[in-house]
Regions:
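Bacterial Sec-dependent N-terminal signal peptides
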Residues: 1-25
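Detector for outer-membrane/organellar transmembrane beta-barrel domains
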Residues: 228, 238-242, 246-363
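C-terminal hydrophobic structural anchor segments
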Residues: 341-393
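N-terminal periplasmic/intermembrane-space "pro-region" immediately following the signal or transit peptide
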Residues: 19-78, 248, 423
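Outer-membrane beta-barrel "beta-signal"
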Residues: 233-244, 382-386, 391, 410-423
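Outer membrane beta-barrel
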Residues: 61-87, 92-221, 227-243, 339-347, ...
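Transmembrane beta-barrel architecture of outer-membrane proteins
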Residues: 101, 139-141, 217, 272, ...
Length: 423
């Protein structure tokens, strides 16, 4: 692994050799700058000073750690530049989208003890900072502190992703398509503020499991307060019958790590949002007339990876006993289900081809407001990995069909191109 400290060590050795050839005057010896790292009196001092310099690795950020190890800070950034073209059924261009879709800055590490871990993530594009009702800022994505007593348990307090469905748990930097599916876009729970806990049973290549849960405000990220008094309760169980994936491959789409043995994940989750005030629970517009609803969301995931081949399927849905509001508002809670299936193959850790089919099935009572009986989207994607998921180029093409659509002139085709760069 190539590291910047190696270059610093070579520079230091050269400078020491030069210093021996040219003796310093007494006046010059008094003018030693405090920041000079190449005038160490011994090899031990030099190595200690180099140890305090930041460590830079592509894909793993810039890490600072003092010699007393009382804290660690890793800084990362990433950006996604997107070009998307939409076409109608006659393949006439109807929309052009060209923008920086995501621009994120992330800080991770520990303070005081490696058992006290923190994570902060900020988003700066319009896609990341959708305005909240009341004008609250929406830049902060993650701001959480974890207590990690050992590799089995951890508990966190703050704002982060709700561990519900696999596609949402995955980072948007680790996708094998330009973006997540239409099913995930409708039903995911995104982020919230509250308490989070995890239990991870690890038994080598044998059976493993993880249990994750949270109690959160139920209103989504950066909401601040809830006048309803309701909370959201979420639990997820993950089973690994053949052992865990390499390098957290279960939260990275595709089989980039090239599993030598078959690896499988079967997971399920349920979330109950009591007195939610937004149409999608932790997301969406505010319900009209200060109304609230109780919502249940359910998720089932399956993953199989083996020697460059990957297969995923996600089933998820939402239930609400009273999804409709006054007709003049046009507001409704999207009751229904969605199914996503995708498969891919990786060639020589450079090229990947992937196919995805996603379908939304709104319940009959909300179909008139959703505008269709079901919505199917098929996507073909190609990815060129240059430095893994840290530097890659992606392109995909989607075709949409909506049965009994109220608006028959919807966009049928979509072609997208995206460049991702991260440190």
């Amino acid at each position: 692994m190539k590291k910047i400290p190696i270059l610093l060590l070579l520079t230091a050795c050269w400078s020491l050799a030069a210093a021996q050839e040219k003796p310093q005057t007494p006046a010059a010896q008094k003018r030693k700058p405090r920041t000079e790292i190449i005038a160490a009196d011994s090899t031990g001092e030099l190595l200690a000073q180099l140890r305090n310099m930041p460590n830079i690795e592509i894909g793993k950020g810039i890490t600072f750690r003092p010699k007393n190890d009382w804290f660690e800070l890793t800084m990362r950034f990433r950006m996604q530049n997107l070009l998307a073209l939409s076409f109608d059924d006659d393949f006439t261009l109807t929309k052009t989208e060209a923008r920086v879709k995501r621009l994120r800055l992330r800080f991770d590490g520990y303070i005081y003890s490696p058992k006290l871990v923190y994570s902060v993530q900020l988003g700066f594009t319009s896609y990341d900072t959708e305005p909240l009702p009341g004008g609250d800022m929406n830049i902060v994505r993650d701001a959480i502190v974890y207590y990690v007593p050992n590799a089995t348990w951890n508990i966190g307090f703050g704002q982060t992703k709700i561990k519900a469905n696999r596609a949402r748990i995955n980072s948007s930097s680790a996708l094998q398509f330009v973006d997540r599916s239409i099913v995930n876009s409708e039903f995911n729970l995104d982020r919230d503020f509250g308490f989070f806990g995890e239990y991870n049973m690890r038994h080598g290549e044998g059976f493993n499991l993880s249990a994750k849960g949270s109690v959160t405000l139920g209103e989504g990220r950066n909401w601040g307060s809830s006048p309803t008094g309701g909370l959201a309760y979420t639990g997820r169980l993950e089973l690994y019958p053949l052992g865990r994936f390499k390098s957290k491959g279960d939260v990275i789409e595709g089989n980039y790590e090239f599993e030598e043995r078959v690896k499988i994940l079967l997971a399920g989750a349920y979330s109950y949002n009591h007195k939610a005030s937004r149409l999608k629970g932790q997301r969406g517009a505010v319900m009209p007339g200060d109304a609230t609803r109780n919502m249940g969301s359910y998720f089932v995931d399956f993953i199989l990876e083996y020697r460059g081949f990957a297969f995923y399927t996600d089933f998820m849905g939402r239930s609400c006993s009273d999804p409709l509001f006054s007709p003049e508002t046009g507001a409704f809670v999207y009751n229904g289900q969605g199914l996503n299936v995708q498969t891919s193959y990786l060639f020589n850790k450079k090229w990947e081809i992937a196919l995805r089919n996603s379908t939304l099935f709104p319940d009959s009572e909300v179909q008139p407001l959703a505008g269709y009986r079901n919505w199917n989207q098929t996507t073909l994607g190609i990815t060129r990995y240059i430095i893994g998921h840290s530097l890659k180029v992606q392109a995909d093409m989607s075709y949409n069909t909506r049965s009994r659509s109220i608006h028959p002139d919807y966009n049928r085709w979509e072609i997208r191109f995206q460049l991702e760069l991260g440190l």
